């Protein structure tokens, strides 16, 4: 049994408290803990099915991606009502844009006339189709709209 004098008890409690705070990382915030590192997860990945082969999908929600034959590299020609039917794949400013395994082409972003940054693949803007509501849906293939392929 350890006998602690009246003044020594306060000293021991203070020392134990300091050790506990130090063991828990201290009370001052760490700059690395408060600054999130940018994500390096892919923006676009591939999906394969027997009817369409391998095509691009959004990495977050796995929805099918399309390109518009009336677009030119670096320019979206889909605006207004077109965007209601064919929403653009957009990212926040500064977000990294890259492909997952099996996607070897070049990704970039363009600033749309309405403001957002739209993801491009091989220079062509990428879009969703509003009637694709479930993972694996590929209902947006039309003469002017084609599956985005790696």
Language-model region placement:
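Bacterial lipoprotein signal-peptidase II cleavage site
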Residues: 24-35
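Hydrophobic core segments of beta-strands in well-ordered, beta-rich domains
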Residues: 65-68, 127-129
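Acidic glycine-/aspartate-rich tracts in secreted/extracellular proteins
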Residues: 69-74, 94, 131-135
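A low-complexity, Ser/Thr/Gly/Pro-enriched, surface-exposed linker/loop concept
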Residues: 75-107, 144-149
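Short, low-complexity cationic-aromatic patches
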Residues: 41-64, 110-124
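Extracytosolic low-complexity repeat regions of secreted or lipid-anchored proteins
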Residues: 99-150
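Sec-dependent bacterial lipoprotein signal peptides
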Residues: 1-22
